[in-house]
Amino acid sequence: MDTANDKLERRLYSHDLAPLPKEMDVIFKTMPDQVVRPGYTEEVVQIVRKARAVNKPIVPRGAGTWGLGGSVPVKGGIVVDMTAMNKIITIDEKNMVVTTQPGITWKALGDALDAKGYFLPCYPSSAPSATLGGWIGTGGTGIGAYKYGSAGDIVRDLEVVLPTGVVVHTGDRYVPQNGGGPNLNWLFVGSEGILGIVTEVTMMILPKPEELRVVSYSFDDLKLFSPALKKIVRSGATPMHIMFSDRLHFEYLRAAGKEAPKVGCLITCALTGSKASVDVEEKILDEAIASAGGKKESKELAEHEWHERNYEFRLREMGFGAIPGEILVPVEKFDVVVEGTRKIVKDLKMKAPIIGTVADNNTVMLMPYYLTDEHKLVASTAAMGFAKRLGDLAFENGGRPVGLGVFFAGNLAKYRGKEGAALIRSLKDTIDPYGIMNPGKLVETGTRYGFSMPAFLMNFGMHMMGSVKRILPRDKMGEKEISAMKK
């Protein structure tokens, strides 16, 4: 088992996709006291038992590709880096399941399955870097979810080390867990690491389809996609994936020297199945898009966009930080939320491209992102007000942020209702009586001082960050590059 005590190395674990400025250490102790990298389940058990014996916080971590602070310490403690547990245990072709350690990336697993003629029904857009355990812990919905279901839907069994050091299996490897008590898989899917550490994952796999066809369509504006989207989800067509990006996203990409279309927005759909079924579904999509005034784009553009599906935040290559806001909203409210997002962006004097996916027949995931200098306190913390307002917009329209982490932990009652939130806290207290497993997340906003920040105070603070942003000068990040590109 590898252990890191060096200060510089520990600092690398004090942030995730959206780093906080060092000044936030006044509230949170984001630097771990130690980093350990176990190689197998027994080592995880040892870590947990030793941490419990000395009442030391434990923070499970995959690749840190989420942006809500779920894998970042708030009270120091031990970060358990699971990326060394990255082996495929078995690919069971007879039963069409795969069992792996949780630290393998989705891309590495997908490549191994592809070589044997299989594919993952669902995986994140961050597949090249995201780990199985991390994405399952956030309850991920991603590529393939529209047709095959989200992360939790494809999980058959999890091996989990509880905060007591006990190892449990949550499901049945070959059949769904539909009886014999509550489905324990779903107890841990989306739990954000507060109930235990996943050490083994068994998931369903599927034979590669006869055909995977990608088609792209454009509109003059993202809002104009709404009527077509409402037709598609009611049409009976089941694309594997539907993703969209607006004009500003492509302007930023071109400013970064990347190839990108000059359109108001682009919708890209992946279809899987037999050639005959794909032909039928493509025709349905063509008609739905045309009826709303959209235009079908070239096969070459569609294939280019599909190739780029795992690289949403190439803008970081321009040297900027990118703070993503991720929300889930009803399909019926798509145009309302797009307009609401633009109003937030305008009020906060920002520029924020809107990208996203259609998660299922009822749900859209919007992922507007904001360029910022993550090393400047005022600019970076003020941008958190953007995430707060975006989350509020989702709640107002029957949706929610994609997760809670540190920053939205005060919204648990909004998610689950007062009684539901109390039940989740009771489960946390029962499974983790000493409160050592990823403390300060989901059920509370913890601080370095050992007490939790009241929900109203955290929400008020994030709201005030947005108010600060409104009085700051208009953001100009990226404008120089875009202006140069337009000349």
Residue ranges of predicted features:
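FAD-binding subdomain of flavoenzyme oxidoreductases
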Residues: K87-M243, S483-K487
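C-terminal substrate-recognition/cap domain of FAD-linked oxidoreductases
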Residues: N5-P21, P207, S218, L224-R389, ...
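N-terminal flexible segment immediately upstream of the FAD-binding catalytic core
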Residues: M1-R49, T65-M96, H249-G257, L301-A322, ...
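Activity-critical C-terminal alpha-helical subdomain
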Residues: F408-K487
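Short, ordered loop/turn segments at secondary-structure junctions
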Residues: G62-T65, S125, R247, V406
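Conserved short loop/turn motifs at secondary-structure junctions
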Residues: V35, V97, S216-S218, F408-R416
